[in-house]
């Protein structure tokens, strides 16, 4: 069938890609990000490619990764590629490249090149259509920018549900806010999935960027949070399932994200999501652990801080403070975990994480091979990173682990020592001790087992409680019994140790013995077994050193306290049973060290050993018993022999007199032994009972102890003994340095690695050891500094840097204690080393020492004097003088060798000057001479080598400045001022570009000007010139201070010098002033006022302010910033000084205008070659002065001063003011020919008057008005008007004075022949009336009469007329009824003026508007005084005005609106009724304005007034309704075209509706029937055009009537049904005469049907009357255009009738009539049924479709009747009818839900 083929063809056309349709292709490619659619559509691909490729090339320069796309999507071939011509595989490959480019370009989309490049993808490859997801997600991070808006505008309409959130914003073309995006991510899973997939893919391609990742992280985090919040449920089970689903959906994203650890922002985003999951979802411990492990696996240096925060949050969610081992190891590997944890702990809860780390540190103690974990543990408690309760918990973890460590195996000695030290730290720390005691008290720990395991004593613990726990007490040893026997057995086979255990630091068997000894503690049996080992040789202990030396080494080492105590105990036990013929003095040094231990238990046991030794000496029978181990204590070598042993007698004396008396104090105070040793060796024992030791004995004791320090191989006891001896500088004639110098050299020779190894083995601090070693050198040593220097000089790389630093530190410590002569010698030596050519720590250290210590003055002088000599020496390296003079740039030619010498010299000079600078040069004034010589040498040298040498100059100047500043504070300079070289200092200011040098030189000049002004002032001006061009523009605080000081100190000296020379100070300082004014624009804005104020204050405000103001005004004219500065400067002065300044200022202006200028030539450059024209200078100065009068504080200052009557200041002010006024008037009079100067003087005069109060101003004006010149009088009145335009004074005296001034103005109006003067007077009257008229209206009435009279608005001049009328308008507003006397003249003359203003060819818009302004004021304030005749004139003139194109409408319309609002309603209706004909004759505009006036009058007046004047209103409306008929009757003479009539009738209908609202039914119904009769029978039937016109107007009204009032007036339809039927019978849309009537009738019916709520149209009588005539209107559809009209107008009316009919019978009747027009065949009558024309059938089908759509199944109840017709129509000859019936069938099927095929067969 033809119709089927057509459908197929249309479908193919719809899906076609238009490959041959170039226009369609152009439209498809006209979407653009950067061009409008119209512009884009006109571009070809060559143009587009050129633009976009340019952007692409710029991108390639920014990022080389873009270059790969040049071969593909940006190749020239891409211009011809069309996606629609590619196959699926090619398109897929292209998509991959396009999406890769989009991901890469996303980070630069805010750059223009990127947008251009992206536009190529839009224009050529249409990525917004084919790759919509990737395109949107690329641009989405910029959702708030105009760029995203451009993208929205070109996106396809059919966006997928993924991006449905963008649809509303695409339609309205506004940027989406963030909240909807978050909401979509939370609720729309495809959207979030797409975003996540895009971000992960971009990250894998290394294309992710900050904008994308920050956007994604925020959206993803909030979405996850929102999803978890939304899944909250009252039922735990349901909530858990939902949360698990969310977690499972999020974990894969986190897994992918955390796997890309190099992309830090992606990883941090994942951390954020982890935090949200942990806080809002109840995660299981295994999930938390997995997340933790993923986090530590992902962190890098950049993300570790965020990772730790995330870890802390996750750990906080766990019920127990535990973390996986992998996480703990990762934290352990961090560079400084404690610092990083402390940084985050201040902001986040980290307690669980920290406690978990503590638990990790003490986990598997027996398996820990190193001390890394325990070191971290100690640091955690020392750094106090935990809170109080968490610290207690942490201590509990440590203590529990330590007390149960024996269950898992034996702790290493290192671990045991570490933990023992930590527990001792708990007990000793002031902050930790209370917490520790509380933890011990609250825990159920076995303290005994703890002490046993750690071999320490917990002094705060209560021992009895622990001992009660018998089971634990027995359990601990039982576990260890298995360890001790095996170890003991292995040691039993060891032979006797060949030498002392003190003979070497590393003895393998000793470590095993120490371990066995530690295990034996606690069991006497074990200790005895241990003591009897062969290797110890106990049986021969008195003759060989092995046995005792073992215990000495144990208690002297860094072992647990319990172990050391037991060793001491073993020693004291042995000594108590020893024979008395053995001298055990070898033990004394070690016991002395033990007596200074921090542990009281050790000190107690050491005191016991000391007492045992003392007892042996008491019991000794021989004076000199043999010394135990004298030749083998430190081995068989010379070390043992190098010890200076004491005799037994001497040692006995030492014990008796020095050591034993303080036995109890040693136990109580660890520092007591040090004091005793010091006092003993010094010979100043505090105990009066003990006799002092003789000098030889003290020397012997000192040598004895020192020799042990030197020979002892072990460094732990060596350090303790050295600490005791370093308290004593000398004893018995020898010095500490002499005795211990070998140790100093030995330590130096150890080297870095060996020293570190020694300290690590013995667990002592290398730094502490080095500090004690260098203390060996005492300040009383003759060449202490030189000795220290010799230790490290010459420098060797094997030297420990820390040791070198310690040596230099010692130099600094003792420097102040050595004599000055030795200081000088030492300083010279250090200086020599400092200048060595080396970068070694030796040179740096010497320099640092010299910088840190106070170098003697003579040495500094010698150093400084080396500089000029060195400079002279190096100049010999340059070329001959002649060559230097003739050289182009004076550059000294130097070889490489010379350059090295130059570099060395520069380094030397720098060091010397830095040394001087750091040595408080103010304390060494003798340096001044050398420094000035240095300054000269530097200047000379600078000119030779063409170098600024800024740093050296600033150092030299800074030192001189310090000396000079101190000299300023004394009566007499501290140095010889003859050495001052001011020229050099000035050169420093002028020739350097360094701000530091400039500032220092300026300060030095300032200082020198105080102490030696005669040497400085002759060179001051160049300084200020330079300051103006350079220094003043600086904005740092220091430069500000420099400038302030320079002004404060130099300027007063300069002024005083000029006065001493009897020179004019202003002229003399003109150069200075010029420098500052020229520098104004360079001075930072916030400093200008302060700087100039300081300058003027120092110069003298009264003498110099005028000059500064004038120079600024001359140079910068009316620059706003300059004016603000000038205002600030002037405002700071008193009123008298400010006025005096203005007098001098005006004198300067006058001087500049003279033929032979005086001071203005100096200050302003008048008359000079490069000076400006005097007139321009004068204008600038006068305008600036006017600004000053307006904006400075002179007005308030004058008012305040003048308030004090009879004061001297008030007299000065009056005198200066009078002088200024005279000067201004004189300038104005003499310069009238120079218009610019005259105007500027007028501005000044205006501003000057502005400084007066209103009363004083009027007094002055009255005097000036008496002067003869009209020009001055006009100017004065204009000034008064200007003053009144602002906010004049409102106080009562000012108001009365102003009203009293009115007669003066009235006199001018009535008598002056000068129109301009009159105009000015009227303007003043207007302002006075407006501002003050209400105060006393009676005083204004004469003025109103004068204005309304012949002398004002009666004049011929338009300016005075306009001003007068406007003044009358103001008076009407102010005076109200008081104006009635002037009203007759005012109205008559203003009406005449209105008529004059509209004369053809002479229209005067301003006069026209002014008169209407007066009418408006009268309507508002005096509406009752305007008579009917005046209203008629106003309205008639308004009609003329409305017809004029030259005049504006606003003022007239406003007057008419006010008449409608304010005038009596009867008067308004009356004037409209009387003048309606004239309004129509005047044209559409006049008619429209008249109707609008009528409408507003009805609206704004009450209902009662409308009812009262209803007859007149009805008469007006009937006239208005007849407008169409009248205009049609006029034919070609009509003034209204169709549009004008439509517009007028709309207003008439609106007026009628407003009237109806004010009436009731009984009042309106007669009017309606009258109107109906008027429309239907009120005109002869012969007048067909008149009849149609009236009916058209009537039905247009009814359309509005039924549409507006709706169901209220449905019953009124009964009046019009018959006439409607008649009209439908004769009116036709095809007849132009009746078309409008036909349209308005159908529209009226539609409104009437639509709003029927009273079943009016259900009535058969009504329905039958209207249904057939209405449906018959379908017959008018005989052409395509008529069919469209019928479908648009008749079909909706038919549909609304069917809805209103609302019954099956009525519907059947309607359908019967309607179906006639569906069939072309003849009916029974033989006549055509009505559907002969296909357009008619088409219209009828449209009616059926509308009815089906509106009524649905109600209408389809008639389907059986319709089916035959439908069958016929489906075979209709007309293709349009056939297509339309098929649409109707489809519509029916959609409604019924079943096919019609079976019914139609």
From Swiss-Prot:
The keyword rRNA processing applies. Pfam families: BP28CT (PF08146), HEAT_HEATR1 (PF23243), U3snoRNP10 (PF12397). GO terms for biological process: maturation of SSU-rRNA from tricistronic rRNA transcript (SSU-rRNA, 5.8S rRNA, LSU-rRNA); positive regulation of transcription by RNA polymerase I. InterPro entries: ARM-like, ARM-type_fold, BP28_C_dom, HEAT_type_2, HEAT_Utp10/HEAT1, U3snoRNP10_N, UTP10. Keywords: Membrane, Nucleus, Repeat, Ribonucleoprotein, Ribosome biogenesis, rRNA processing, Transmembrane, Transmembrane helix. GO terms for molecular function: snoRNA binding. The chain crosses the membrane at residues 945-965, 1001-1021. GO terms for cellular component: 90S preribosome; membrane; small-subunit processome; t-UTP complex. It is found in: Nucleus, Nucleolus; Membrane. It is a multi-pass membrane protein. Belongs to the HEATR1/UTP10 family. Involved in nucleolar processing of pre-18S ribosomal RNA. Involved in ribosome biosynthesis. Component of the ribosomal small subunit (SSU) processome. This is U3 small nucleolar RNA-associated protein 10. It comes from Aspergillus terreus (strain NIH 2624 / FGSC A1156).
């Amino acid at each position: 069938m033809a119709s089927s083929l057509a459908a197929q063809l249309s479908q193919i056309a719809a899906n076609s890609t238009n490959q041959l349709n170039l226009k369609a292709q152009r439209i498809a490619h006209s979407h653009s990000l950067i061009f409008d659619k119209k512009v884009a559509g006109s571009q070809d691909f060559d143009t587009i490619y050129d633009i976009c490729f340019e952007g692409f090339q710029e991108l390639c320069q920014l990022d080389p990764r873009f270059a790969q796309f040049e071969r593909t999507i940006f190749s020239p071939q891409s211009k011809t590629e069309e996606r629609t011509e590619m196959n699926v595989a090619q398109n897929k490959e292209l998509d991959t490249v396009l999406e890769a480019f989009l991901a890469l370009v996303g980070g630069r989309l805010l750059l223009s090149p990127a947008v251009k490049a992206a536009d190529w993808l839009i224009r050529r490859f249409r990525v917004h259509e084919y790759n919509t997801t990737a395109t949107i997600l690329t641009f989405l991070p910029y959702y708030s920018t105009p760029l995203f808006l451009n993208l929205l505008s070109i996106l396809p309409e059919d966006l997928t549900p993924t991006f449905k959130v963008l649809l509303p914003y695409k339609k309205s073309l506004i940027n989406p806010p963030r909240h909807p995006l978050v909401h979509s991510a939370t609720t729309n899973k495809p959207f979030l999935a797409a975003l996540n997939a895009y971000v992960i893919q971009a990250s894998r391609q290394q294309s992710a960027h900050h904008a994308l990742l920050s956007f994604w992280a925020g959206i993803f985090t909030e979405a996850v949070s929102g999803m978890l919040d939304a899944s909250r449920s009252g039922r735990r089970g349901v909530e858990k399932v939902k949360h698990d689903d969310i977690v499972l959906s999020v974990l894969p994203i986190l897994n992918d994200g955390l796997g890309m650890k190099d992309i830090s922002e992606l990883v941090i985003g994942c951390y954020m999501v982890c935090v949200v999951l942990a806080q809002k979802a109840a995660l299981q411990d295994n999930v938390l652990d997995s997340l933790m492990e993923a986090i530590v696996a992902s962190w890098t240096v950049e993300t570790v801080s965020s990772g730790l925060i995330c870890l802390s949050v996750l750990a906080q969610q766990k019920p127990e403070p535990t973390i996986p081992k992998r996480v703990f190891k990762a934290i352990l590997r961090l560079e400084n975990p404690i610092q990083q944890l402390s940084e985050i702990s201040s902001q986040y809860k980290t307690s669980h994480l920290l406690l978990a780390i503590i638990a990790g540190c003490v986990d598997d103690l027996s398996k820990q091979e190193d001390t890394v974990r325990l070191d971290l543990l100690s640091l955690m408690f020392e750094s106090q990173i935990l809170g109080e309760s968490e610290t207690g918990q942490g201590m509990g973890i440590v203590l529990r682990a330590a007390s149960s460590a024996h269950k898992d195996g034996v702790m290493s000695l290192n671990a045991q020592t570490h933990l023992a030290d930590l527990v001792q730290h708990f007990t000793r720390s002031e902050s930790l001790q209370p917490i520790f005691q509380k933890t011990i008290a609250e825990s159920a720990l076995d303290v005994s087992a703890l002490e046993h395991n750690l071999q320490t004593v917990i002094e705060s613990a209560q021992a009895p409680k622990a001992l009660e726990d018998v089971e634990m007490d027995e359990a601990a040893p039982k576990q260890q019994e298995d360890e001790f026997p095996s170890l003991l057995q292995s040691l039993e086979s060891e032979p006797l140790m060949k030498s002392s255990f003190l003979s070497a630091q590393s003895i393998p068997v000793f470590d095993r013995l120490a371990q066995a000894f530690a295990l034996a503690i606690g069991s006497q049996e074990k200790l005895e077994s241990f003591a009897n080992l062969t290797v110890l040789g106990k049986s021969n202990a008195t003759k060989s050193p092995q046995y005792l030396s073992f215990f000495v080494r144990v208690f002297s080492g860094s072992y647990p306290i319990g172990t050391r105590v037991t060793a001491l105990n073993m020693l004291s036990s042995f000594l108590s049973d020893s024979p008395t013929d053995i001298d055990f003095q070898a033990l004394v040094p070690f016991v002395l060290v033990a007596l200074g231990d921090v542990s009281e238990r050790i000190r107690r046991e050491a005191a016991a050993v000391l007492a045992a030794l003392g007892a042996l000496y008491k019991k000794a029978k021989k004076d000199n018993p043999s010394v135990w181990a004298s030749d083998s204590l430190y081995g068989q070598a010379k070390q043992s022999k190098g010890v200076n042993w004491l005799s037994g007698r001497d040692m006995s004396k030492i014990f008796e007199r020095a050591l034993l008396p303080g036995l109890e104090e040693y136990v109580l105070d660890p520092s007591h032994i040090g004091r005793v040793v010091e006092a003993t060796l010094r010979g100043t024992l505090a105990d009066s009972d003990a006799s002092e030791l003789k000098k030889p004995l003290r020397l012997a004791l000192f040598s004895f102890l020192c020799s042990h320090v030197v020979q002892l191989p072990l460094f732990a006891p060596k350090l303790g003994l050295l600490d005791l001896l370093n308290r004593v500088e000398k004893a018995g004639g020898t010095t500490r340095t002499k005795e211990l110098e070998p140790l100093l050299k030995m330590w130096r020779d150890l080297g870095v690695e060996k020293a570190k190894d020694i300290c690590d083995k013995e667990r002592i601090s290398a730094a502490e050891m080095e500090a004690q070693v260098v203390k060996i050198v005492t300040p009383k040593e003759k060449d202490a500094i030189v000795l220290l220097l010799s230790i490290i000089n010459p420098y060797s790389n094997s030297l420990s840097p820390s040791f070198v630093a310690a040596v230099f530190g010692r130099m600094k410590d003792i420097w102040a204690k050595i004599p000055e002569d030795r200081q000088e010698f030492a300083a010279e030596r250090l200086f020599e080393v400092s200048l060595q050519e080396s970068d070694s720590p030796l040179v740096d250290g010497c320099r640092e020492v010299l910088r840190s210590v106070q170098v003697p003055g003579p040495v500094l002088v010698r150093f400084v004097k080396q500089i000029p000599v060195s400079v002279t020496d190096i100049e010999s390296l340059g070329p001959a003088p002649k060559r230097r003079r003739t050289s182009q740039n004076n550059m000294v030619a130097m070889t490489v060798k010379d350059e090295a010498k130059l570099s060395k010299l520069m380094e030397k000079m720098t060091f010397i000057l830095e040394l001087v600078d750091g040595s408080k040069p103010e304390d060494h004034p003798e340096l001044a001479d050398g420094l000035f010589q240095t300054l000269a040498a530097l200047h000379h040298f600078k000119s030779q080598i063409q170098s600024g040498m800024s740093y050296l100059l600033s150092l030299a100047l800074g030192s001189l400045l310090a000396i000079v500043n101190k000299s300023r504070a004394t009566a007499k300079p501290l140095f010889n001022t003859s050495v001052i070289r001011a020229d050099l200092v000035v050169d420093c200011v002028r020739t350097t570009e360094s701000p530091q040098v400039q500032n220092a030189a300026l300060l030095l000049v300032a200082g020198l000007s105080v102490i030696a002004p005669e040497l400085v002032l002759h060179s001051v001006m160049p300084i200020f010139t330079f300051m103006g061009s350079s220094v003043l523009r600086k904005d740092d605080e220091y430069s500000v201070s420099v400038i302030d000081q320079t002004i404060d100190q130099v300027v007063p000296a300069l002024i005083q010098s000029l006065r001493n020379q009897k020179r004019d100070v202003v002229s003399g300082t003109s150069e200075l002033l010029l420098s500052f004014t020229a520098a104004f624009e360079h001075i930072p804005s916030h400093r200008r006022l302060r700087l100039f104020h300081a300058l003027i204050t120092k110069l003298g405000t009264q003498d110099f302010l005028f000059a500064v103001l004038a120079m600024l005004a001359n140079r910068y004219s009316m620059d706003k910033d300059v004016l603000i500065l000038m205002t600030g400067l002037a405002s700071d002065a008193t009123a008298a000084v400010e006025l005096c300044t203005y007098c001098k200022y005006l004198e300067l202006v006058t001087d500049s205008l003279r033929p032979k200028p005086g001071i203005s030539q100096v200050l302003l450059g008048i008359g000079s070659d490069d000076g400006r024209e005097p007139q321009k200078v004068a204008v600038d100065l006068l305008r600036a002065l006017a600004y000053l009068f307006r904006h400075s504080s002179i007005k308030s200052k004058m008012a305040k001063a003048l308030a004090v009557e009879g004061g001297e200041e008030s007299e000065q002010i009056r005198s200066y003011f009078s002088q200024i006024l005279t000067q201004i008037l004189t300038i104005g009079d003499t310069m009238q020919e120079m218009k610019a100067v005259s105007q500027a003087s007028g501005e000044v005069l205006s501003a000057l008057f502005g400084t007066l109060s209103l009363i004083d101003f009027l007094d002055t004006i009255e005097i000036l008005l008496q002067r003869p010149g009209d020009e001055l009088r006009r100017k004065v009145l204009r000034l008064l008007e200007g003053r009144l335009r602002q906010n004049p004074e409102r106080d009562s005296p000012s108001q009365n004075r102003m009203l009293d001034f009115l007669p003066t103005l009235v006199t001018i109006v009535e008598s002056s022949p000068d129109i301009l003067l009159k105009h000015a007077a009227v303007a003043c009257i207007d302002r006075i009336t407006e501002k003050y008229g209400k105060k006393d209206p009676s005083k204004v009435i004469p003025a109103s009469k004068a204005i309304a009279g012949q002398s004002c608005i009666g004049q011929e001049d338009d300016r005075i007329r306009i001003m007068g009328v406007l003044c009358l308008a103001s008076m009407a507003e102010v005076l109200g009824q008081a104006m009635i006397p002037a009203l007759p003249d005012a109205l008559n003359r203003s009406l005449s003026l209105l008529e004059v203003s509209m004369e053809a060819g002479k229209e005067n818009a301003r006069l026209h508007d002014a008169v209407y302004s007066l009418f408006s004021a009268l309507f508002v304030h005096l509406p009752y005084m305007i008579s009917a005749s005046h209203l008629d004139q106003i309205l008639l003139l308004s009609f003329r005005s409305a017809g004029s194109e030259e005049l504006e409408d606003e003022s007239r319309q406003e007057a008419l609106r006010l008449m409608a609002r304010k005038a009596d309603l009867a008067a308004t209706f009356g004037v409209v009724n009387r003048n309606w004909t004239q309004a129509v004759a005047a044209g559409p505009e006049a008619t429209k304005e008249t109707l609008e006036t009528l409408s507003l009058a009805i609206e704004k007046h009450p209902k009662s007034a409308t009812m009262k004047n209803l007859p007149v209103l009805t008469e007006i409306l009937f006239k208005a309704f007849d407008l169409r008929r009248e205009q049609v009757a006029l034919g070609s003479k009509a003034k209204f075209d169709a549009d004008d009539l439509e517009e007028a009738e709309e207003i008439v209908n609106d007026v009628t509706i407003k009237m109806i609202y004010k009436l009731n039914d009984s009042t309106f119904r007669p009017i309606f029937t009258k109107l109906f009769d008027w429309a239907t029978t009120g005109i002869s039937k012969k007048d067909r055009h008149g009849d149609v016109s009236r009916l058209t107007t009537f039905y247009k009204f009814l359309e509005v009537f039924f549409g507006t009032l709706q169901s209220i007036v449905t019953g009124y339809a009964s009046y019009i049904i018959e006439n409607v039927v008649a009209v439908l019978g004769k009116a036709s849309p095809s007849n132009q005469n009746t078309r409008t009537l036909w349209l308005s009738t159908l529209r009226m019916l539609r409104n009437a049907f639509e709003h029927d709520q009273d079943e009016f149209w259900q009535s058969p009588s009504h329905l039958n009357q209207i249904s057939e005539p209405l449906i018959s209107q379908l017959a008018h559809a005989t052409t395509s255009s008529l069919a469209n009209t019928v479908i648009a107008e008749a079909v909706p009316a038919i549909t609304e009738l069917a809805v209103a009919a609302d019954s099956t019978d009525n519907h059947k009747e309607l359908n019967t009539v309607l179906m006639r027009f569906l069939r072309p065949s003849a009916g029974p009558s033989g006549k055509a049924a009505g559907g002969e024309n296909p357009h008619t059938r088409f219209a009828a089908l449209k009616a059926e479709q509308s009815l089906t759509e509106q009524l649905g199944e109600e209408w389809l109840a008639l389907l059986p009747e319709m089916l035959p017709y439908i069958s016929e129509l489906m075979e209709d000859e007309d293709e349009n009818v056939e297509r339309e019936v098929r649409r109707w069938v489809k519509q029916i099927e959609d409604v019924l839900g079943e096919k019609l095929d079976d019914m139609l067969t």
